[in-house]
């Protein structure tokens, strides 16, 4: 007898097809999320969809090592899954815990830097990781192109958003995601939401640079989704005008990585 085919998720065929389109333009923040005014909050709706797509039916634990205001944990809880989040900023942790509420059903939000994942999560117990790491130190610098004010995640010395050297920043992320990989079960996905960056005259293709680091750590780069955020912006400015034409970035990359199976020739280091 042929064994039943393993299901990757619980979606029906119609929803599977709709979600498989490579550009997602229908994700919206809730009124509650808009009111939080976090510098880089991604909506629970995005996380819910990613869980629906990449968490197998038997999967239960979802990890976010840079949980910010807790969207990943809140979304996991809303889908009757267990979310675990870490964040270095105690103010954000407090808000995230309020969002989660007292009936957390095993979900937890820890005030710790992302590098402490191994202290709070056992090896090979996580079924899916979803996160958005800091945008380097870009938010701590005044932007000449659009003159937006400085925005800061915090002043902890372990905050990766304060690392000024780009290569050191990428290396630090690689160390974190190496620990995340050890926490993941074989073949589990790690999904990272990022935007490309510009510091002064230098453009940094953050999504591809991070993807290279992730592959060095041992992940398989499985695919990419473009998250179209144009509807969130109603105050675009002519960046660089009139001297240098600059691009208004209104999209982010949803990078889809997978931990190899144990018997893979490219298994994690």
At which residue positions do the language-model features occur?
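Class I S-adenosyl-L-methionine-dependent methyltransferase catalytic core
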Residues: 1-269
């Amino acid at each position: 007898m042929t064994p039943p085919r393993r299901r990757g998720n619980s979606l029906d065929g119609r929803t599977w097809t709709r979600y498989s389109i490579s550009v997602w333009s229908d994700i919206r923040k809730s009124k509650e999320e808009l009111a939080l005014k976090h510098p880089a909050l991604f909506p629970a709706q995005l996380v819910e969809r990613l869980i629906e797509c990449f968490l197998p039916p038997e999967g239960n634990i979802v990890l976010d090592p840079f949980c910010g205001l807790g969207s990943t944990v809140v979304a996991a809880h809303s889908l009757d899954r267990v979310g675990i989040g870490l964040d270095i900023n105690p103010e954000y942790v407090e808000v995230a815990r309020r969002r989660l509420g007292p009936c957390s059903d095993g979900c937890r939000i820890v005030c710790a830097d992302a590098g402490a994942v191994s202290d709070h999560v056992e090896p090979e117990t996580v079924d899916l990781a979803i996160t958005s790491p800091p945008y380097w130190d870009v938010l701590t610098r005044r932007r000449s192109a659009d003159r937006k004010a400085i925005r800061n995640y915090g002043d902890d010395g372990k905050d990766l958003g304060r690392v000024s050297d780009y290569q050191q920043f990428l290396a630090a992320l690689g160390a974190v995601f190496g620990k995340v990989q050890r926490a993941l079960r074989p073949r589990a996905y790690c999904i990272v939401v990022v935007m490309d960056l510009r510091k002064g005259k230098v453009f940094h293709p953050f999504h591809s640079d991070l993807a290279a680091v992730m592959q060095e750590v041992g992940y398989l780069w499985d695919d990419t989704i473009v998250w179209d955020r144009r509807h969130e912006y109603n105050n675009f400015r002519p960046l660089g005008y009139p001297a240098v034409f600059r691009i208004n970035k209104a999209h982010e990359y949803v990078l889809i990585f997978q931990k190899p199976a144990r018997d893979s020739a490219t298994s994690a280091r």
